[in-house]
Amino acid sequence: VIFNNHVLGMVRQWQDLFYGKRYSATVLDDQVDFVKVSEGMGAKAYSVDTIEEFEKAFKEAIELNIPCVIDCHIDREDKVFPMVSPGAAISEAFDREDLNNKK
């Protein structure tokens, strides 16, 4: 499953949460067609924009029992958790609830 917000998502998320929203070099103007790349490598691929489309693709992918990729288009401002702070170890990963508790 690809959470595709058409930017370098985790880098932008770091810039948003830890660097005062000072965005630099994160917007991807030339988009990768993840469906074509996946199909070129022999996987079944889906492109989805809604939760309903995702649920249908996910169910089919599980039933097929072959390599599948689901390219989920999400809003540029959506956050993805869990995540790791810059310079932190994977054992220090945190989720949205941890972030909210720090505020």
PLM region spans:
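Thiamine diphosphate
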Residues: V1-K103
